Amino acid sequence: MSERALRGTRLVVTSYETDRGIDLAPRQAVEYACEKGHRFEMPFSVEAEIPPEWECKVCGAQALLVDGDGPEEKKAKPARTHWDMLMERRTREELEEVLEERLAVLRSGAMNIAVHPRDSRKSA
């Protein structure tokens, strides 16, 4: 198998066509700068939406757009609690009814609940 493999990978990668007569898409160079002072340019299409931040090519930190608005602050949603999810499914009146039903079952002794779970086991 190794004898039949092509020996030059450049044959596949290199295009021998010329760029003459080909109109490239219009581009714009956008400059970014990171906290460490690295500045670099990225080419974007004229029609593309320019991202406000980009990963620095040198150090990998977040670089911000030079002469541009900073990234938009995302509004953080308040965390949904168990109570919030419960209130989405039931009204307060329904919860009161369920509570009364469960308390009535407990008071009637219909549920066999051991005070200490260890007491309900058989001793050896």
From Swiss-Prot:
Recorded consequence of changing residue 59 to A: Colonies remain small
**Record-listed Zn(2+) binding positions:** 34, 38, 56, 59
Q: Name one GO molecular function term.
A: bacterial-type RNA polymerase core enzyme binding
Keywords on record = Antibiotic resistance, Metal-binding, Transcription, Transcription regulation, Zinc
Cite the residue spans of the region called Sufficient for interaction with HrdB (SigA). Answer: 73-124
- What GO biological process terms does the UniProt entry carry, in alphabetical order? positive regulation of DNA-templated transcription; response to antibiotic
Q: What happens when the gene is disrupted?
A: Grows slowly, colonies are smaller. Not more diamide sensitive than wild-type, sporulation normal, 15-fold more sensitive to Rif.
The protein in question is named RNA polymerase-binding protein RbpA
Q: Could you tell me which species this protein originates from?
A: Streptomyces coelicolor (strain ATCC BAA-471 / A3(2) / M145)
